[in-house]
């Protein structure tokens, strides 16, 4: 499953090959992790492998945001999906700083929310962020 976002960008499920790219290194970048808890602890390759394996078993949808030339540049997800309450939490991380400011959260977010509401039959999607995270607050308002 691949969803085209624009001529340059698309989303697809996170894959084992992503562990060999820049993805694990994003969590060592304090700018990338400024508004989340991912950068607080060192993460081993085994950690990322276990995370990827857990996606097959639990209540998350995690997509890689990809650029035609640069490959995997970020992730977007629905987490804590509750089939009973029909809710989920929205999260996004653009790890490749060359792609910041290109509205990827909005492009990918629209596609992910359409998937959540149409395919997963969700009724409500929420997100939480730091009060100082102006980018996420603006994104949430637009979505």
Regions found by a protein language model. Name each.
Residues 1-19, 29, 62, 66-143:
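Acyl-donor (CoA/ACP) binding surface of acyl/acetyltransferases
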Residues 16-24, 45, 49:
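An amphipathic alpha-helix signature
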Residues 26, 36, 103:
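Short, flexible helix/strand-to-coil boundary loops that buttress conserved ligand/catalytic motifs
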Residues 31-51:
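Conserved GNAT-fold acetyl-CoA-binding loop/helix
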Residues 52-53, 137:
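Short amphipathic alpha-helical segments and helix-helix/interface helices
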Residues 53-59:
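Short loop/turn motifs at secondary-structure junctions and domain boundaries
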